[in-house]
């Protein structure tokens, strides 16, 4: 029985090897077109470091990922300009949590509520 297993494996291995050889011999249409174009235009190989456009973009540096990033940066610039224009404003918010004793008393409303009556 073990001899039968070895014989059954041999055709599978040979078929895998034959498949690899067939793949090497058969060229996809894209590869054949690429070979034709390389033969026709030998000087147009891929440039080292990518295309000129990509190189320019990388040198320039990307400022914003999308319009949201642009708007956030724009708002920060406006906030910086406003803070430099009014430096005497000393009111700081968010430093402490208010308690009922810290809050001012409510003023009575001038208009009587229709629900209270």
Swiss-Prot record:
Its main location: cytoplasm. GO terms for molecular function: phosphatase inhibitor activity; protein phosphatase 2A binding; protein phosphatase inhibitor activity; protein phosphatase regulator activity. InterPro entries: Endosulphine. It is found in: Cytoplasm. Residues 1-37 have a biased composition (Basic and acidic residues). One of its GO terms (cellular component) is cytoplasm. It comes from the Eukaryota. GO terms for biological process: cell division; G2/M transition of mitotic cell cycle; mitotic cell cycle. Residues 1-52, 79-117 are annotated as: Disordered. The modification Phosphoserine is found at residues 28, 67, 109. The modification Phosphothreonine is found at residue 99. Keywords: Cell cycle, Cell division, Cytoplasm, Mitosis, Phosphoprotein, Protein phosphatase inhibitor. Phosphorylation at Ser-67 by gwl during mitosis is essential for interaction with PPP2R2D (PR55-delta) and subsequent inactivation of PP2A. Protein phosphatase inhibitor that specifically inhibits protein phosphatase 2A (PP2A) during mitosis. When phosphorylated at Ser-67 during mitosis, specifically interacts with ppp2r2d (PR55-delta) and inhibits its activity, leading to inactivation of PP2A, an essential condition to keep cyclin-B1-CDK1 activity high during M phase. Interacts (when phosphorylated at Ser-67) with ppp2r2d. Belongs to the endosulfine family. This is cAMP-regulated phosphoprotein 19. It comes from Xenopus tropicalis.
């Amino acid at each position: 029985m073990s001899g039968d297993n070895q014989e059954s494996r041999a055709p599978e291995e040979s078929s895998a090897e034959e498949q690899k050889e067939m793949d090497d011999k058969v060229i996809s249409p894209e590869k054949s077109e690429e070979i034709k174009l390389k033969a026709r235009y030998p000087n147009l190989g891929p440039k080292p470091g990518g295309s000129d456009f990509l190189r320019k973009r990388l040198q320039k540096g990307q400022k914003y990922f999308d319009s949201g990033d642009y708007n956030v940066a724009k708002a920060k610039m406006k906030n910086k300009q406003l803070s430099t224009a009014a430096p005497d404003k000393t009111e700081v918010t968010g430093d402490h949590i208010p308690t009922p004793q810290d809050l001012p008393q409510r003023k009575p409303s001038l208009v009587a509520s229709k629900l209270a009556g």
